[in-house]
A protein has these predicted regions:
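Short beta-strand-to-loop acidic/aromatic patch adjacent to the donor-nucleotide binding site
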Residues: 82-97
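Short, well-formed alpha-helical segments that are part of the catalytic scaffolds
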Residues: 11-28
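Active-site nucleotide-sugar/metal-binding loop of Leloir-type enzymes
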Residues: 71-86
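A conserved acidic beta->alpha catalytic loop
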Residues: 34-45, 61-65, 91-92
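Conserved beta-strand positions in the Rossmann-like core of class I SAM-dependent methyltransferases
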Residues: 31
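Conserved donor nucleotide-binding strand/loop of the catalytic core
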Residues: 50-68
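Catalytic-site signature of metal-activated, phosphate-bearing donor transferases
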Residues: 68-74, 98-293
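Cell-envelope/extracellular polymer assembly enzymes that use nucleotide-activated donors
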Residues: 2-4
């Protein structure tokens, strides 16, 4: 079994090498798609690719970001690999805490073709802000940002199909032919909030994107600063905290979103049905009038 990663990056110079090095502990190849980085990220990944042939530059474009960039990379390389191989959607600011391959082998043994991760969101807190001017910027992001909560889950792994493409008009984390979910999930450290400057730039990029990141557009500009006392402190080599109450809160929120989504869809179907009934009545009345005339 081979594990290949797809990594889309834009202006992640402060963390991209740490992300790639972490993933290279278990990935056979990492295919990088640079979305017009201007902060030195492009130069860093080019140098990395020169020194490590497992890092492959798949594309470099100034197109507006779309989730379908992942589809494009998959379509470029999927026929190079076997049915037993897997793909890893590697976000440029994420690092798994463990090798996922043993879990992927178990997923295959159970005839599954998709696996999610639990996301440990690492926050820039009031404690980080107070110490920011004095902190050692030479330390890695994971050494400087320690406060987290595990509160989200997303698909990150899917099984390869040598014969099937991933249509580029479809959005989503995994292809539509990979819907058999393996429920156990590894934990992924997500460093979306690293410095005040990076947080501001990240938000601006997302606000200016007409196609994606609607969840960001619904938040205020000052929503990012978290209180350290509301988080757990990460120490490498120790088990991460994931209380049962946090799991309940997550599943409750997902149930709420699902019910809202179902209600909206039922309402839309009802409106469509009423519209069709009205059109049919008009059609029947017109035909009856023409017949009687």
């Amino acid at each position: 079994m081979k594990l290949n990663a797809i990594c889309i990056i834009k202006n992640e110079a402060d963390i991209i090498l740490e992300t790639l090095n972490n993933a290279l502990r278990f990935c056979d190849n990492i295919y990088v798609f640079d979305n017009d980085s201007t902060d030195g990220s492009w130069e860093l990944i080019c140098e990395k690719a020169l020194n490590d042939d497992r890092v492959v530059i798949a594309a470099h474009t100034d197109e507006i970001y779309r989730n379908q960039f992942r589809n494009r990379v998959y379509n470029m390389f999927h026929d190079h690999f076997l049915q037993s191989d897997w793909w890893y959607i590697l976000d440029a600011d994420e690092m798994l805490i463990e090798d996922p391959r043993p879990m992927l082998i178990k997923a295959m043994q159970r005839d599954k073709n998709q696996m999610r991760v639990w996301q440990a969101q690492f926050y820039f807190t009031n404690v980080d802000l107070d110490a920011y001017d004095q902190e050692n910027k030479a330390l890695t992001v994971s050494e400087r940002r320690r406060y987290y909560r595990i509160n989200w889950r997303e698909p990150r792994f899917f099984k390869n199909s040598p014969s099937k493409k991933w249509p580029e008009n479809i959005s989503g984390k995994v292809p539509p032919f990979c819907q058999k979910l393996y429920h156990p999930s590894p934990i992924c450290r997500h460093y979306a909030e690293r410095t005040p400057e990076q947080i501001k730039l990240r938000r601006e990029i997302r606000l200016n994107n007409p196609y994606s990141f609607l969840h960001v557009k619904n938040k205020s500009d000052d929503d990012w600063l978290k209180r350290a006392e509301d988080c757990f402190y990460y120490q490498e080599g120790t088990k991460m905290s994931f209380p049962f109450t946090d799991r309940i809160v997550y599943y409750a929120s997902q149930t709420k979103y699902w019910l809202i989504w179902r209600a909206k869809n039922v309402s839309l179907l009802k409106d469509e049905f009423v519209t069709k009934v009205i059109k049919f009545k008009k059609y029947a009345i017109t035909n009856l009038y023409n017949y009687l005339s």
